[in-house]
């Protein structure tokens, strides 16, 4: 140390010192924060999306199988009836939106499985979490809207039209009405599970 006091520089001793005013050697290397894994939250996300997929598939399969023939007696006249989901615009919309929601849920489950194989976080970034939140809300509202429209048609078939001679169509067509009601119930349950997925997305956003 006395060599520095005698005016000798550090290069003569084989020592290199940082330049004056530079903090490069004093600052620790910066690393980007990794996304949290949250295994319990990831399991809840998988369960909610799997349930939404099952409900959407059930809604489609039940509605597609809803068709029946029967006869209706009005003023003693036998009128042949044929009921099928494709004859109603509202029921067609329910089938289409439920199929789209099933495809969306399946795609998300496959994405989660892919990230699990790579041992990466289920939700790697805030941007991805925002995309999930937007998709979940869109399909939840779409299924709610389609289910409500289909429920109005099913209720009209079951109660008939008041102040007219049109009676309850579900009496001669019980199978069609029961399958339609079950399909609509599954659609509402699928909407609920998609809404639960949206809540889980919000929790992910709060932790990223």
From Swiss-Prot:
Keywords: Cell membrane, Glycoprotein, Membrane, Transmembrane, Transmembrane helix
Subcellular location: Cell membrane
GO CC list: plasma membrane
InterPro entries in alphabetical order: CASP/CASPL, CASP_dom
Primary localization class, coarse: membrane
Glycosylation sites: 157
Pfam families per UniProt: CASP_dom
Annotated membrane topology: Multi-pass membrane protein
Topological domains annotated Extracellular: 65-92, 150-183
Polar residues bias (residue ranges): 1-11, 17-33
Top-rank taxon: Eukaryota
Claim: Hydrolase is one of the keywords in the record: no
Transmembrane segments: 44-64, 93-113, 129-149, 184-204
UniProt topological domain (Cytoplasmic) ranges: 1-43, 114-128, 205-208
Disordered as annotated region, ranges: 1-33
UniProt similarity note: Belongs to the Casparian strip membrane proteins (CASP) family.
Alphabetical list of PANTHER family matching this protein: CASP-LIKE PROTEIN 3A1, CASP-LIKE PROTEIN 4A4
Subunit structure, as described in the record: Homodimer and heterodimers.
Protein name: CASP-like protein 3A1
């Amino acid at each position: 140390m006395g060599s520095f006091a005698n005016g000798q520089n550090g290069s003569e001793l084989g020592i290199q010192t940082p330049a004056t005013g530079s903090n490069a050697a004093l600052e620790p290397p910066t690393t980007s924060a990794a996304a949290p894994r949250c295994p319990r939250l990831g399991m809840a996300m998988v369960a909610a999306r799997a349930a939404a997929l099952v409900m959407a598939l059930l809604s489609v399969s039940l509605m597609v199988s809803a068709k029946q023939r029967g006869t209706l007696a009005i003023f003693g006249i036998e009128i042949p009836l044929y009921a099928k989901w494709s004859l109603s615009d509202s029921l067609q919309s329910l089938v289409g939106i439920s199929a789209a929601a099933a495809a969306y849920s399946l795609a998300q489950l496959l994405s989660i499985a892919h990230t699990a194989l790579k041992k990466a976080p289920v939700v790697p970034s805030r941007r991805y979490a925002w995309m999930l939140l937007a998709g979940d809300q869109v399909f939840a509202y779409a299924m709610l809207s389609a289910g409500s429209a289909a429920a109005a048609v099913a209720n009209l078939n079951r109660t008939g039209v008041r102040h007219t001679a049109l009676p309850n169509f579900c009496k001669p067509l019980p199978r069609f009405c029961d399958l339609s009601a079950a399909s609509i119930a599954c659609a509402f349950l699928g909407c609920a599970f998609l809404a639960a997925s949206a809540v889980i997305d919000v929790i992910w956003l709060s932790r990223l």
